[in-house]
Protein backbone atom coordinates (compact mmCIF):
# COMPACT_ATOMS: atom_id res chain seq x y z
CA UNK A 1 0.00 0.00 0.00
CA UNK A 2 2.83 2.38 0.84
CA UNK A 3 4.54 1.86 -2.55
CA UNK A 4 1.35 2.51 -4.51
CA UNK A 5 0.80 5.75 -2.55
CA UNK A 6 4.28 6.96 -3.52
CA UNK A 7 3.69 6.02 -7.15
CA UNK A 8 0.33 7.80 -7.12
CA UNK A 9 1.92 10.90 -5.53
CA UNK A 10 4.63 10.98 -8.21
CA UNK A 11 2.04 10.67 -10.98
CA UNK A 12 -0.12 13.45 -9.51
CA UNK A 13 2.83 15.81 -8.97
CA UNK A 14 4.14 15.11 -12.48
CA UNK A 15 0.72 15.89 -13.91
CA UNK A 16 0.48 19.13 -11.95
CA UNK A 17 3.94 20.28 -13.11
CA UNK A 18 3.26 19.28 -16.71
CA UNK A 19 -0.09 21.07 -16.62
CA UNK A 20 1.48 24.21 -15.17
CA UNK A 21 4.15 24.21 -17.86
CA UNK A 22 1.76 23.72 -20.76
CA UNK A 23 -0.77 26.26 -19.48
CA UNK A 24 1.71 29.04 -18.74
CA UNK A 25 0.44 32.12 -20.54
CA UNK A 26 2.63 33.53 -23.27
CA UNK A 27 4.20 36.87 -22.42
CA UNK A 28 2.03 39.65 -23.72
CA UNK A 29 3.60 41.81 -26.37
CA UNK A 30 3.36 45.36 -27.57
CA UNK A 31 3.18 46.13 -31.27
CA UNK A 32 5.06 48.82 -33.20
CA UNK A 33 4.08 49.81 -36.75
CA UNK A 34 5.35 52.98 -38.41
CA UNK A 35 6.84 53.96 -41.76
CA UNK A 36 6.65 50.44 -43.18
CA UNK A 37 8.47 48.88 -40.20
CA UNK A 38 6.54 46.63 -37.82
CA UNK A 39 7.58 44.41 -34.93
CA UNK A 40 6.42 43.10 -31.59
CA UNK A 41 8.32 43.55 -28.36
CA UNK A 42 7.81 42.16 -24.88
CA UNK A 43 5.90 44.01 -22.18
CA UNK A 44 8.18 45.69 -19.69
CA UNK A 45 10.54 46.95 -22.39
CA UNK A 46 10.83 50.66 -23.21
CA UNK A 47 11.12 51.73 -26.83
CA UNK A 48 13.26 54.76 -27.67
CA UNK A 49 13.01 56.25 -31.18
CA UNK A 50 16.39 57.45 -32.47
CA UNK A 51 15.37 57.67 -36.14
CA UNK A 52 16.78 60.22 -38.57
CA UNK A 53 16.42 61.07 -42.27
CA UNK A 54 18.47 58.02 -43.35
CA UNK A 55 17.15 55.30 -41.06
CA UNK A 56 14.58 54.14 -38.58
CA UNK A 57 16.44 53.27 -35.39
CA UNK A 58 15.08 52.07 -32.08
CA UNK A 59 16.61 51.10 -28.77
CA UNK A 60 14.85 48.78 -26.35
CA UNK A 61 15.69 48.52 -22.68
CA UNK A 62 14.21 47.03 -19.53
CA UNK A 63 14.83 48.27 -15.98
CA UNK A 64 15.15 44.64 -14.80
CA UNK A 65 17.82 43.83 -17.40
CA UNK A 66 21.34 44.91 -18.12
CA UNK A 67 20.62 44.22 -21.79
CA UNK A 68 20.04 46.57 -24.70
CA UNK A 69 18.48 45.67 -28.02
CA UNK A 70 18.69 47.86 -31.11
CA UNK A 71 16.91 47.82 -34.45
CA UNK A 72 18.31 49.85 -37.36
CA UNK A 73 16.49 49.88 -40.71
CA UNK A 74 18.04 51.92 -43.53
CA UNK A 75 15.36 53.82 -45.47
CA UNK A 76 16.92 53.23 -48.90
CA UNK A 77 16.09 50.15 -50.96
CA UNK A 78 18.95 47.67 -51.24
CA UNK A 79 19.28 44.61 -53.45
CA UNK A 80 21.27 41.51 -52.47
CA UNK A 81 24.15 42.48 -54.78
CA UNK A 82 24.48 45.84 -52.98
CA UNK A 83 24.50 44.37 -49.45
CA UNK A 84 28.33 44.10 -49.38
CA UNK A 85 28.52 47.85 -50.11
CA UNK A 86 26.05 48.60 -47.31
CA UNK A 87 28.01 46.35 -44.96
CA UNK A 88 31.22 48.21 -45.77
CA UNK A 89 29.53 51.64 -45.50
CA UNK A 90 27.75 51.37 -42.15
CA UNK A 91 27.75 47.87 -40.61
CA UNK A 92 31.52 47.28 -40.44
CA UNK A 93 32.21 50.76 -38.96
CA UNK A 94 29.47 50.18 -36.35
CA UNK A 95 30.97 46.83 -35.29
CA UNK A 96 34.47 48.37 -35.22
CA UNK A 97 33.27 51.27 -33.04
CA UNK A 98 31.75 48.90 -30.48
CA UNK A 99 34.88 46.73 -30.53
CA UNK A 100 37.01 49.85 -29.91
CA UNK A 101 34.72 50.86 -27.05
CA UNK A 102 35.21 47.42 -25.43
CA UNK A 103 38.99 47.86 -25.67
CA UNK A 104 38.77 51.36 -24.13
CA UNK A 105 36.81 49.82 -21.24
CA UNK A 106 39.69 47.41 -20.58
CA UNK A 107 38.28 44.31 -22.29
CA UNK A 108 39.92 42.10 -24.89
CA UNK A 109 37.04 41.29 -27.25
CA UNK A 110 37.04 38.08 -29.25
CA UNK A 111 35.39 38.45 -32.66
CA UNK A 112 33.70 35.58 -34.50
CA UNK A 113 31.18 35.07 -37.28
CA UNK A 114 27.62 34.22 -36.28
CA UNK A 115 24.27 33.69 -37.98
CA UNK A 116 20.63 34.09 -37.01
CA UNK A 117 17.33 35.09 -38.59
CA UNK A 118 15.55 38.42 -38.81
CA UNK A 119 11.87 38.22 -39.67
CA UNK A 120 12.35 34.75 -41.14
CA UNK A 121 15.29 35.83 -43.33
CA UNK A 122 18.76 34.32 -42.83
CA UNK A 123 21.00 36.93 -41.24
CA UNK A 124 24.78 37.07 -41.14
CA UNK A 125 26.38 38.37 -38.00
CA UNK A 126 29.33 39.07 -35.78
CA UNK A 127 29.71 38.08 -32.15
CA UNK A 128 31.99 40.19 -29.96
CA UNK A 129 32.63 38.34 -26.70
CA UNK A 130 34.37 40.11 -23.85
CA UNK A 131 34.68 40.08 -20.10
CA UNK A 132 34.21 43.39 -18.30
CA UNK A 133 35.19 43.36 -14.65
CA UNK A 134 35.11 39.56 -14.64
CA UNK A 135 31.55 39.50 -16.00
CA UNK A 136 31.40 37.71 -19.39
CA UNK A 137 29.20 39.36 -21.98
CA UNK A 138 28.73 40.04 -25.65
CA UNK A 139 27.60 42.33 -28.39
CA UNK A 140 25.79 40.43 -31.12
CA UNK A 141 25.24 42.08 -34.52
CA UNK A 142 23.01 40.62 -37.24
CA UNK A 143 22.04 42.02 -40.64
CA UNK A 144 19.83 41.01 -43.54
CA UNK A 145 17.73 42.46 -46.32
CA UNK A 146 14.12 42.41 -45.22
CA UNK A 147 11.57 43.92 -47.59
CA UNK A 148 14.31 45.50 -49.76
CA UNK A 149 15.80 47.37 -46.80
CA UNK A 150 18.90 46.61 -44.75
CA UNK A 151 17.97 45.65 -41.20
CA UNK A 152 20.68 45.57 -38.52
CA UNK A 153 19.85 44.19 -35.09
CA UNK A 154 22.14 44.38 -32.09
CA UNK A 155 22.00 42.74 -28.67
CA UNK A 156 24.36 43.98 -25.91
CA UNK A 157 24.77 42.69 -22.38
CA UNK A 158 26.23 40.26 -19.89
CA UNK A 159 25.83 36.60 -20.83
CA UNK A 160 23.54 35.87 -17.86
CA UNK A 161 21.03 38.56 -18.94
CA UNK A 162 21.31 37.71 -22.64
CA UNK A 163 20.27 34.17 -21.73
CA UNK A 164 17.57 35.27 -19.28
CA UNK A 165 15.95 37.69 -21.73
CA UNK A 166 16.38 35.55 -24.87
CA UNK A 167 12.57 35.24 -25.30
CA UNK A 168 12.28 39.06 -25.57
CA UNK A 169 15.10 39.14 -28.15
CA UNK A 170 13.55 36.27 -30.11
CA UNK A 171 10.14 37.97 -30.14
CA UNK A 172 11.63 41.17 -31.53
CA UNK A 173 13.91 39.42 -34.03
CA UNK A 174 11.28 37.02 -35.34
CA UNK A 175 8.47 39.55 -35.81
CA UNK A 176 10.35 42.20 -37.83
CA UNK A 177 8.45 43.09 -41.01
CA UNK A 178 9.40 45.75 -43.53
CA UNK A 179 6.95 46.91 -46.19
CA UNK A 180 6.57 49.93 -48.40
CA UNK A 181 5.15 52.74 -46.29
CA UNK A 182 1.50 53.22 -47.02
CA UNK A 183 0.81 56.59 -48.66
CA UNK A 184 -1.15 59.03 -46.59
CA UNK A 185 -4.81 58.97 -47.40
CA UNK A 186 -5.79 61.96 -49.47
CA UNK A 187 -9.28 63.35 -49.31
CA UNK A 188 -11.36 62.42 -52.30
CA UNK A 189 -12.79 65.33 -54.28
CA UNK A 190 -16.43 66.03 -53.61
CA UNK A 191 -18.69 66.46 -56.60
CA UNK A 192 -20.04 69.96 -57.18
CA UNK A 193 -23.79 70.37 -56.81
Question: Which positions does each model-derived feature cover?
Answer:
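N-terminal secretory signal peptides that target proteins for export/translocation
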Residues: 1-3
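Bacterial N-terminal signal peptides
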Residues: 6-16
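Disordered, low-complexity segments in secreted/periplasmic proteins that are enriched in proline
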Residues: 20-24, 190-193
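N-terminal "mature-domain start" segment
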Residues: 23-55
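Soluble non-cytosolic domains of exported or imported proteins
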Residues: 36, 84-93, 159-170
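Solvent-exposed, polar/charged alpha-helical surfaces in well-ordered, non-transmembrane soluble domains
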Residues: 39, 43, 92, 96, ...
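Surface-exposed amphipathic alpha-helical segments
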Residues: 45, 149-193
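Conserved polar/disulfide-associated segments of primarily extracytoplasmic proteins
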Residues: 51-139, 145
Amino acid sequence: MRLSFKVMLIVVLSSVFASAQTQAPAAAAQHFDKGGLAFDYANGWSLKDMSNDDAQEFGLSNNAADVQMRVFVHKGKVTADKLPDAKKAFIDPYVAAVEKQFVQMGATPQKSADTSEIGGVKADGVLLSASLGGDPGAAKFYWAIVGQRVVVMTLFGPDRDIKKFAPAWDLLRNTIKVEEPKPAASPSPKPSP
